[in-house]
Structures are given as C-alpha cells and as structure tokens.
Amino acid sequence: NEKATYDDWQNHLTTLFPQVRLKQYLEIRSMDACSWNEICGQPAFWTGILYDNDCLDEVNNIIKDWTLEDKFFLYKNAPIYGLDTPFKKGKLIDIARLLLKISQTGLKNRNFVSKGGYDERQYLKNIEINLENNLSPADKLINKYNQDWGKSIKNIYKENIF
C-alpha cells in the first residue's frame, strides 16, 4: 500500500530519454554518431540558437507552420534518409544549413572570445564542413564501413572511442 512520493517520480523521470527533457535546465539529447572533433559542435549549435532572441525568432519563423504530421514525418524519415530526407520544397540538408547560419549568427552576437581571439563559432566548423560535403556523421561512418573497413563493424570502436 505504498504510494509514490514526489522524489520517487523525480527518480523515475531520470530513466526516460526523450529528445528534450526539462529539469532544472533544458537537457537536449546529443548526437549519437559523432567523433571526438565534432562533439563540441552540438552544444555550440544549440547555444547559438537558444541564447539569442533574434535567432530564436528566426527559427520559430521557419518551423511555426510545421504540422504534427510534418514533425512525425521528419522523426520517422530522417534516421533512414538523413540529410537527403525530402521535406517541404527541398531536403533536410537545406534546413540544416539554414539553422547552422542562424546558430553562427547567435554565437557571433554572443561574442564570447577566447584568449586566442576565437569565438564559439569555431566549434561549428566540423558541422559546416559536413554540410558542405552533404554528409552527416552517420554518413561518414557508413562510408568508412563500406569502403575503408571492409564491412567490419569492429573499426567503429577503434576509431570512435573517447
């Protein structure tokens, strides 16, 4: 006849892993297939968007008319087709490139500069290169699997452990 307490529910919620989870802070699920030199890109990407109101407004203008069906379509198809996923009048890569530019603007506006004179946009460089080459981190791994690794999955662990 025990009843769950608030602390019990708090504990249970830590076992759920949605794309975004609201805690004392906003927790966003990380990219699953990135290398060590790409790992700082995702938090920088979100920082550029979420910490700049103009950038948030720009992103809102892009997505405000997306229906639930649109979002479900992307959720279902992006893992299969990646950046080549057809969406609206283009492909997912078109949206990714646009969002990257918005994030770069947000980081530039934020103006957090290192002692070496670099702002946080430096962390987006690998994402920018990937998008210029029409490749996601998963695409790069698939290419290595098919071409360099002789279709052996073992090398993924050797090259991507950190």
Task: Say what each PLM segment does.
Residues N1-F162:
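C-terminal accessory/tail domains of diverse enzymes
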